């Protein structure tokens, strides 16, 4: 098994898959999750679902045995982000993220806020959104390639005390070389078939490609949530992960 995965999972739950629960309400979410096995995946709640349902749904999913990635991408003054991370830790959240562009003081405050917890959430920096291309960066005044900006922000996140970053699979290999084997790389934009890309994720890869590139966790939304048999998809991705690790 990939040592990066086993470092952050119990022996009963060593899977790289994070399922993005891209639903808009509690009923649909619980109806989908009811058929999932917490040993096959972690789960992620983003802004839409959390805004619609609040912490009650998040805590319910944690109580069902799921490791929860609270994907709210904090970006605020250091005190506010630190307090938000403490609340997430109190809830039992497994992973929480923030924009690395919020700067060193913000990230250091977040790391300090959760340092005293026996089981603290993984703190993950968001580097460059996977929907963004070089032209998008240029429009906001960053005349650099996405890959260069990702590495710059990832180094800042690591030196500020974060556990890892969100990055596309294309950036995983250079980040692994730059930041070492213990830094967590969370990769969205994962598709079972790269030709099947109807949404706003630009820099995509298959599970096997992403794992080979050095990704630790694979975020999958519609390829799982809209599958005819989501459990079969999860089992297949985990099979690929086991092959890749051995």
Curated annotation (Swiss-Prot):
The keyword Lyase applies. It is an enzyme of class 4 (lyase). Homodimer. Belongs to the OMP decarboxylase family. Type 1 subfamily. NCBIfam families: PRK00230.1 (NF001273), pyrF (TIGR01740). Keywords: Decarboxylase, Lyase, Pyrimidine biosynthesis. Catalyzes the decarboxylation of orotidine 5'-monophosphate (OMP) to uridine 5'-monophosphate (UMP). It comes from Neisseria meningitidis serogroup A / serotype 4A (strain DSM 15465 / Z2491). The active site is at residue 73. It holds the Pfam family OMPdecase. It comes from the Bacteria. Substrate binds at residues 22, 44, 71-80, 130, 191, 201, 221-222. GO terms for molecular function: orotidine-5'-phosphate decarboxylase activity. One of its GO terms (cellular component) is cytosol. HAMAP family: OMPdecase_type1_B. Pathway: Pyrimidine metabolism; UMP biosynthesis via de novo pathway; UMP from orotate: step 2/2. This is Orotidine 5'-phosphate decarboxylase.
